């Protein structure tokens, strides 16, 4: 099931990659088991009053657990928040890169090299793995993907893609989570 991509504002959006996490995480403990590092944040185009942030564990853990249902990347949807002064979740391998990226929907692809693609069909990097089929079989729907290859000077996931799924009810996407990630 797919939601109407017409609801997605595909204008350019600020995407903060690296640096300090949003301030709303200053007093939150995100994991009992893994060290988590802030990867990126952006305003949710499906709900402009919310922000989406993604955290990643150490690379070897992320690589070992990169598929559904065991993916260790953490997506948190939260209230709008400015950048923290605390470096508690700062990723040790990336400096802050603040950029303006275009979002796209299925009709724009593949002509546009957009950092974030909302709706439509999954565009896998690693053909033949059927990661999408496993997630959909459990009643989840594709919401968006983050294309790291379209982000200048960023390669935390080996120029890969992060795939986000959730529940689709009418034109609302709820309970988003990172289902898996692939690398090129």
Question: Over which residues does each language-model region extend?
Answer:
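Preference for intrinsically disordered or flexible, low-complexity segments
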Residues: 1-184
